[in-house]
Amino acid sequence: MKRELPFGEDVKTTKRSVYLIADPFLRFWFRYINPNRSLLELGLVDQVYETCMHTFNHHVGSVWEDCARMSTAFLPIDTIQWKPAHRWWGPGTNRQPLELDVVAESIDGRHILLGEVKWEDRVDVAVLNSELKQKAGYLPFVKGRILHYAVWAKKIQGGKPSGCSVFGPDDVLMSLRR
């Protein structure tokens, strides 16, 4: 189990945390195998497979998000060294709920990295970059800091917009092999 806090929250005082199964293989077990054990024991593997495939990309997407957050400290994002990344969720300055997949602070504390993670066949990076910039205007912790944007995606559609770093599975795996 792991306790996940939104970026910038104090470990000792926050009540805004979620508890998750840390190991992706155990998450797979409790999401797909355990609920279908009786069907699998009856040999109905094909039926279980069909049912599981409807949500499997969502499961892989959550693991991909974890990998993206782990990779931020090792990837060359705007030649800045980053602290470990976190998710962030909560009300923006406009009191509307916001969620970001990747938020990291630079080692010197002057820069903030904002990122989106998608596990889809075609991701339009320009649209995601635009959404990130829009969300950045409502984040309570970005005042006085230099913002950087990044997208982690399974497959990229279109070109890479200026001012946005883009990473795929090969980039993430290479960075995590260190």
Predicted regions mapped to residue ranges:
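Short hydrophobic beta-strand motif reused across regulatory alpha/beta modules
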Residues: 1-2
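A cross-kingdom feature that marks ATP-driven nucleic-acid transaction machinery
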Residues: 5-178
